[in-house]
Each structure stands twice: as C-alpha cells, then as structure tokens.
Design a protein with these regions (language model features):
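Beta-loop-alpha module in the N-terminal Rossmann-like domain of NAD(P)-dependent dehydrogenases
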Residues: 21, 39, 52-111
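Core-facing hydrophobic residues within beta-strands of well-ordered domains
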Residues: 31-33, 66, 146, 194
C-alpha cells in the first residue's frame, strides 16, 4: 500500500455504532470499506449497499484483504477481536471501553505496544468543535480560573435496546461503561487528571444486575470539583447527544447538559452559552448578567475522528 492508497478497512460488529462507522468509512475518501463482520446474516444487505463483503466471523476475512480494523462489538469481545487484528498486523480502532475489565485492557494495550502497531480508542467527542472551544476558554482563563462543573446524562433507553443485545443487561453493559465513559473522557480533556472519585449506583428502575443510574463526585488535581448525574432510565432533554445532535439514534433537544463555572463567568456545554457580568466587570451575585452563545460548526465527530 502506497501512502496515497485508501486504507482498506474492516468494521467488526455492525450494531448501533458499527453501522455508523461503516457508513462513514464508505463515504470517506481516505478509506476503502472492504469487509463488515457480524454474525447477523441481515447485515449482508448492508454490506451490499456499501459495496463491500460480509462475513459472519472475523476468521473468514483474509488477513491480506485489510490494512486496518474498527472493533465495535460487545465489550467482552474487544480483547479477542483485538488480538486477532494484531495477529494480522492491522492498525486498530476499538470502540470504548478498550475492554470490559482493567486486566483485559492492559493485556490488549501491552500486546499492541510490544508489536509497535497503533491501537486507538474511539473517544470521538474530542473531535467536536465545541470541545476545542471549551478547552480554549478554560486554558486561556477567558472567564477566570475554573471552579466547578455539573454534568447530567439522562435518557430513557427503549426496551428494544436491551432485547437486541443480552450483553447490555450484564455487568459490562450498563451506562457507566457504555455512556458515562464519554463524559469521563471529556472531563479529563477539559479539567485534567483526577485525584479522587466517590460514587453511588442503583439498579432500582429495571432491577437487573447492571446499574441503571449513578451519582458521581469527582475531585481533580487542580482542585476543581464536578458532579455527575447519570441514568439510562429517565426521559429527559439532558445529554451530550441530545444537545449536539451528533447521534442520529438520540433525538436532538438543543439543551446543554453541562454547566461549567469560573470566577468571572460560566458557560453551558456543548452549546457554549456564556454568562458574564452585564457591564463587563468582575461581577458578583448582586449584579445582572448577560449571555451570548458561541456558534461552532455542525459536524459529526464520529466522521471527524476518521
């Protein structure tokens, strides 16, 4: 493969996210979607639409047919599929989390490091322009030093979501590993390293073995404190996906789910509505505020990640 040739790609797992990866790769000039791997025979139709081949098992894909892989399978499969990709010398992007346990994740990362092959993790929201702008505002102290943040991720997943994949009712299929991990990555990117975490979880909404809600308190090394309310069992307008419209599976609301507080102002995220003193002074609780919204380009960060 020359540097100008498109990257021959296999997408492993064609569920909610895998289908999006496949469609983005099909329309991307730098990629040649070669294979879709999924045990569901109905995915053959999708492969035909995207002008690629389908296989029920990764073992049926010749090693020489691809240069890279995207793994979008259930969490417990990330390690075995990742090691198979490694054995075939494929650069690999694995959907978050990198694996279902810390030990499995360390095994996969170590194996790729020893081989000198790229292993990427799909934290695609860092490619959203609102992240870049928020990071710029915090880094430059445009609103003064960062003090605190409050995050909500609250949606109601339909029953069909759980019926489509039994693994979503197991210990590695709850909103902490599937959904909160995105918020955690954004917090690390914006607020820096973590010093301390306290949390409580509950499964009282569905009564299953996996959590359906959580409350989390995070202290960062900088002294910043953040609170998180998380649930996949409550109907609400508050989620990054709803606010940004980045995920076609989740209805857009346009309502930001984060509040970020600084000494001279605060802002909502990802919508970037900024609140400051109405007169442009330092301000305090006795003075009126003004607000303005910073506009950013409307993009699909999953596509930008490629």
């Amino acid at each position: 493969m020359s540097r100008n040739d498109p990257i021959r790609l296999v997408v492993i797992g064609a569920g909610l996210v895998g289908q999006r990866h496949a469609r983005h790769a099909f329309s991307h000039q730098d990629f040649d979607l070669a294979w879709i791997v999924d045990p569901n025979e109905a995915r053959q139709e999708m492969a035909q639409q995207l002008e690629c081949r389908w296989a029920a098992s990764l073992e049926d894909v010749p090693a020489g047919d691809c240069d890279a892989a995207i793994i979008a399978t259930p969490n417990a499969d990330h390690l075995p599929s990742g090691l198979t990709c490694l054995a075939r010398n494929w650069a690999t992007l694995v959907e978050k989390p990198v694996a279902e346990t810390i030990a499995s994740g360390e095994t996969l990362v170590s194996a790729f490091e020893v081989a000198g092959l790229p292993l990427l993790v799909g934290h695609h929201r860092r490619y959203h322009p609102s992240f870049d702008k928020a990071n710029e505002m915090i880094s430059s102290a445009a609103l003064g030093p960062l003090i605190s943040a409050s995050l909500i991720w609250a949606v109601r997943k339909p029953d069909s979501y759980f019926k489509a994949g039994a693994w979503r009712r197991d210990s590695d299929g709850g909103p902490l590993l599937i959904n909160f991990i995105h918020e955690a990555d954004l917090m690390l990117g914006l607020f820096g390293p973590v010093d301390e975490v306290q949390a409580m979880v509950s499964s009282h909404a569905r009564g299953s073995t996996v959590e359906d809600s959580a409350a989390i308190l995070v202290r960062f090394a900088s002294g910043v404190i953040a609170t998180v309310m998380l649930t996949d069992a409550a109907l609400s307008p508050w989620s990054f996906e709803g606010a940004s419209g980045e995920n076609p599976t989740i209805a857009e609301t346009g309502i930001s789910s984060w509040r970020i507080g600084c000494t001279a102002g605060s802002f909502e995220f990802p919508g970037l509505r900024v609140w400051t003193d109405a007169q442009g002074d330092e301000g305090d609780w006795s003075r009126p505020l003004k607000d303005e919204t910073i506009e950013t380009a409307r993009v699909d960060p999953l596509h930008e990640q490629l």
